[in-house]
Amino acid sequence: LSTYYTDEEIQAMDEKAKSEAWYKMWRNFCVSDSYEPGSPQKAFTVAGAIEEGAISGNEVFECGGKLHFGDWDIRCVARAGHGPLTITQGLMKSCNVVMMRIVSLEGKEKFVQYQKIFGFGEKTGIDLPGEASGLIYQASNMDPASLATNAFGQNYNCTMVQMAAGYGSLIN
């Protein structure tokens, strides 16, 4: 700390102030920075839909390369489409269209409920300073295009710690 503060300033700090000063020097982006998770979200989309009975896990969905929501064509990674895919194949091929079809069956209220159950949009409570909460939609202000893109991890954000904690919950 002596690089940035005088001895007098350091001595005047309580432990919390010192922790904050150290944090500023060695900020932990895994805790403090949020990002759009992308494809790692897809497992949570499937898990919530199965848990709610919106899907059984045995469905086959057609991927034509895009789906239309509102004023938007939202594309899959496979621009020409994957063709018919099981849910497992949809996860393996990282198919955005399969996730959009699943979340359309689940609905925005249940999707948002499961984002919260898995810990997105809230601090984890990890014992490190500077934890961010991430940003998720409320069902009341989520339009169809936002629901579709959230299903494959875009248009919302979380921290790496939230994603790791979410996977811990998912695996259990």
Predicted features and spans:
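Beta-lactam-recognizing serine transpeptidase/beta-lactamase-like catalytic domain environment
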Residues: 1-39, 44-172
